[in-house]
Amino acid sequence: MTTSSPLIAIVAGEISGDILGAGLIKALKVHYPNARFIGVAGEKMLKEGCETLFDMEKLAVMGLAEVVRHLPRLLKRRKQVIDTMLALKPDIFIGIDAPDFNLGVEEKLKAQGIKTIHYVSPSVWAWRQNRVHKIASATDLVLAFLPFEKAFYDRFNVPCRFIGHTMADAIALQPNRQEACRLLQLDENQHYVAILVGSRGSEVNFLSEPFLKTAQLLKAQYPDVQFLVPLVNEKRREQFEAIKAQVAPELEVITLAGNARAAMMVAEATLLASGTAALEAMLCKSPMVVGYKMKPLTYWLAKRLVKTDYISLPNLLANEPLVPELIQADCSPENLAKHLSLYLSQMPEDVAKKNALKQRFMELHQYIQCDADAQAAQAVVDVLNRE
């Protein structure tokens, strides 16, 4: 590519994608100060100067029922993006996450000779692995946060670049517990356990009871311990409080409006659902127990669809069972409390194990701390410069 002012199209479908898009635009401006950015943008991308075809929130739908209800509108929006891009002929199109929306766009554009990148690999390595063929036909390059994702694509000869994880860039290698205590207005001499019941309504429904009963068992064993419960919004707080009133009305907990990251930095141990929270706990160097429950039919299907040995990102990254994963029937208060109590124990052998675990967390953090924004921008430059 000879132009120093490329037209770069970027589509983000939700808040997390908007954050990634803004970081990418900022890093791309170092290479191309006169580039023009257009696509579907949220607040942060708009601040970086990206033009948007429509409000990003028009793409942000959660859950199958909501997707089905909004399908005609989503298809109309996708056609609008495709038609606009074919008319504008950008030098490159970057779809950030939202694979159900973006891969269809990328496939159409690539067929017309427009270079395409998909930023954030779908969990194709874990389930519905046949999607890799669609990804191959839709993209010139996949940008992956995690090294095992690249290893998966390599098996299928799909171009993929491991860029590190933006969260690993955002969290310091040595978490500042003192600062986190100040932020949350907590006594730094106190012992805390963080309890994360999930961000989805279904997770709060399934996990609040076993997690609260676990807290009761720990309190009986360690009377000085206090429990921090960060909740993503007011709706989830009300949902959690209603379950707590039924299950453990006497148990004292400190509920927090968000601030999960600070809570995990403060805590001696964290009890959480699987997902990105487990990676965040690892980066905060918080020893954790992963517990998960779901509807029996969902679990039956998941058992047959999921192709990985582990469900939590720390274990997947390490390719070994670093942290306990207690799923479905195993996710009992007794089991959860037994594993968590080892992190609270002051017995020399337990303290040594806990310190060794934190050291592994540190090594994994360093492994995926690569300045992902800059790496992603360089990948875009490399694809643009390809003939």
From Swiss-Prot:
GO annotation terms (biological process): lipid A biosynthetic process
EC numbers on record: 2.4.1.182
UniProt entry keywords in alphabetical sequence: Glycosyltransferase, Lipid A biosynthesis, Lipid biosynthesis, Lipid metabolism, Transferase
Catalysed reactions, semicolon-separated: a lipid X + a UDP-2-N,3-O-bis[(3R)-3-hydroxyacyl]-alpha-D-glucosamine = a lipid A disaccharide + UDP + H(+)
GO MF, any single term: lipid-A-disaccharide synthase activity
Entry superkingdom: Bacteria
Pathway: Bacterial outer membrane biogenesis; LPS lipid A biosynthesis
InterPro entries: Glyco_trans_19
One annotated Gene Ontology cellular component of this protein: membrane
Matches recorded under SUPFAM superfamilies: UDP-Glycosyltransferase/glycogen phosphorylase
Family in the record: Belongs to the LpxB family.
Matching HAMAP family: LpxB (MF_00392)
Protein name as annotated: Lipid-A-disaccharide synthase
